[in-house]
């Protein structure tokens, strides 16, 4: 059972304010063509706009509940034919196809707890790519300001939806809790410094094309967010 299953119906209203990455991932999908593989597809926050732009999406997620919401949203939008949704793990995606683009949006790789798991996931993504194909993902590491503002406090993130962040700077973990009425879940995220992601990509056989500091493609120059583009 995924930690997202209890909050599958809560996820969209919880993340409703997260829109800054959608056009970026849709543009990259259009540049690569159908199909694209999206790892951690969730409820289709990015996959459905991608499908609406005319791109077929093979979406993998470890939460059956999130995939059910994604399928429902796809049907409601008349896009079910463009969505191929599969239950599976980031480290062992159930995909035999070879594609030009694999994405892992919205920090999904931070669910991986060790370098061993990260390398397994990166190698799996590389295995889905045709020669020259690209992996695009985004991750973050917190600023001290982030930690100071949020640590150990319940904060109303959206109307009726509370979120709590418990940061452990020594272990580089974020224990994130979300709740609405009787729906609640807690998950752990493990962050890394950008230099470490760069080294892991190289170890997994990728060549890094770009590391951006935001979805406007500004080159990374320090800060919390990194957006990585690497090719096989």
Where do the language-model regions lie?
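A short glycine-rich, Lys/Arg-flanked "PGG" loop and its adjoining helix->strand segment in the class I
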Residues: 119-131
């Amino acid at each position: 059972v995924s930690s997202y299953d209890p909050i599958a119906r809560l996820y969209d209203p919880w993340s409703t304010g997260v829109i800054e990455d959608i056009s970026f991932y849709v543009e990259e999908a259009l540049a690569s063509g159908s199909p694209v593989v999206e790892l951690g597809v969730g409820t289709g926050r990015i996959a459905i706009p991608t499908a609406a732009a005319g791109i077929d999406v093979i979406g993998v997620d470890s939460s059956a509940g999130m995939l059910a919401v994604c399928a429902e949203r796809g049907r409601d939008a008349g896009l079910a034919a463009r969505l191929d949704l599969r239950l599976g793990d980031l480290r062992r995606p159930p995909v035999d196809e070879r594609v030009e683009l694999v994405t892992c949006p919205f920090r999904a790789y931070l669910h991986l707890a060790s370098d061993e798991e990260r390398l397994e996931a990166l190698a799996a993504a590389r295995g889905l790519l045709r020669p020259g194909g690209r992996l695009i993902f985004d991750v973050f590491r917190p600023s001290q300001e982030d930690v100071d503002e949020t640590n150990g406090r319940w904060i109303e993130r959206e109307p009726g939806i509370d979120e709590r962040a418990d940061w452990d700077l020594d272990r580089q973990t974020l224990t994130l809790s979300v709740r609405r009425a009787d729906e609640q879940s807690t998950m752990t995220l493990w962050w890394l410094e950008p230099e470490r992601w760069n080294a892991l990509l190289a170890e997994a056989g990728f060549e890094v094309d770009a590391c951006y500091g935001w979805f406007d493609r500004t080159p990374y120059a320090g800060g919390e967010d990194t957006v990585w583009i690497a090719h096989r």
